[in-house]
Design a protein with these regions (language model features):
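NTP/phosphate- and nucleic-acid-binding module
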Residues: 1-321
């Protein structure tokens, strides 16, 4: 279910979770005219937990998946590379709510699969890697990294991970669990998890990939890390109160644009993947005020392509840039 959460959040819910002081200087803290402490949201776990606890009371309303696409702000110490790492950025955040850990990990697997399919559709080879949970917390996390020499993350991986086709799996629990196991049993980590001895032990020398990558997605399972301290409770099947189990799933939309450029660019041309390209074909005839023959040819090609339902743009401007 889509929603839209505000960018400005109350500090009170962050104090409830215990993260207000822990988050550090990346959080932009402000006060309103009454002196009330506010913040520009760097992430939304507290806010979505507050929304959920005010409206959902029973297991009968589960599972739930809520998401929004919204701006975030983090006071990055070294913003650089344009949209790749900036202080304000556009992001898709989704949050799952389940009755117990077993069902919650099924939701996690579904999002794991959905992310792989999404990046695959964008013609991107995104590698899911076991990741540190950082300030989000929890005990299960994967980041999705695409290889690019301009990336910030150091990547250590077994090249066999590229041989796994996400399309071979079905959108059902047993298949999704196998999918996550198949991907995660092959060595692939960033520098945060890298251990040289393990890399050499588990990956043959000829299969080792050591390069740079760009993180374009990150998913977390953190159980009741937020629901318990924030008293986000539901009635279970026996009528007892229990803390809801949660996960979060993010894709950096603005960063993804830059990442696609880095992954698809060569020294001669930048080629957008078809699902996000503005047009399939652009016709640029060499025209002038005194000669319309090329424009007429361009119009003929344009009409033929339109008949074939090809998304085409005809540039009929007769002025040089």
């Amino acid at each position: 279910q889509e929603m839209l959460m505000p960018t400005i959040q109350s500090s009170e819910i962050w104090k409830e979770s215990g993260r207000y002081e822990d988050y550090g200087e990346e959080m932009l803290r402000i006060k309103d005219r009454q002196g009330k402490e506010m913040l520009y949201g760097p992430t939304n776990e507290e806010l979505i937990t507050d929304v959920f606890r005010s409206s959902v009371k029973s297991y009968k309303s589960l599972p739930q998946l809520l998401y929004h696409i919204q701006w975030k702000f983090r006071d990055e110490i070294r913003p650089r590379f344009g949209v790749m790492r900036c202080k304000e950025f556009y992001m898709k955040d989704a949050y799952s709510f389940d009755l117990n850990d077993e069902e919650a990990k099924r939701s996690y697997n579904k999002m794991f699969y959905s992310y792989l399919k999404t990046f695959n559709r964008l013609d991107l080879k995104a590698i899911p890697m076991a990741a540190d949970t950082g300030p989000i917390g929890g005990d299960l996390s994967h980041e999705f990294v695409i290889l690019a020499e301009t990336g910030e993350s150091d990547v250590y991986a077994d090249k066999n991970i590229f041989e796994i086709d996400p399309n071979q799996y079905k959108f059902e629990d047993s298949s999704l669990q196998k999918m996550r196991e198949d991907f995660t049993k092959i060595y692939a980590v960033t520098d945060e998890k890298y251990v040289k001895e393990d890399f050499n032990r588990y990956v043959k020398k000829e299969n080792q990939i050591v390069t740079k990558g760009i993180e374009v997605g990150h998913i977390f399972y953190f159980s009741d890390k937020y629901s318990e301290p924030m008293n986000c409770l539901i009635d279970d099947k026996s009528g007892k109160k229990t803390s809801v189990k949660m996960g979060s799933y993010g894709i950096g939309v603005s960063r993804l644009v830059g990442a696609i450029i880095e992954a698809k660019y060569n020294n001669e041309v930048m080629k957008w993947p078809k699902p996000i390209s503005p047009f399939d074909v652009v016709i640029i005839p060499n025209i002038s005020k005194n000669n319309n023959k090329n424009l007429e040819k361009g119009e003929k090609i344009y009409k033929e392509l339109k008949k074939q339902n090809i998304d085409v743009l005809l540039d009929d401007v007769d002025e040089n840039m």
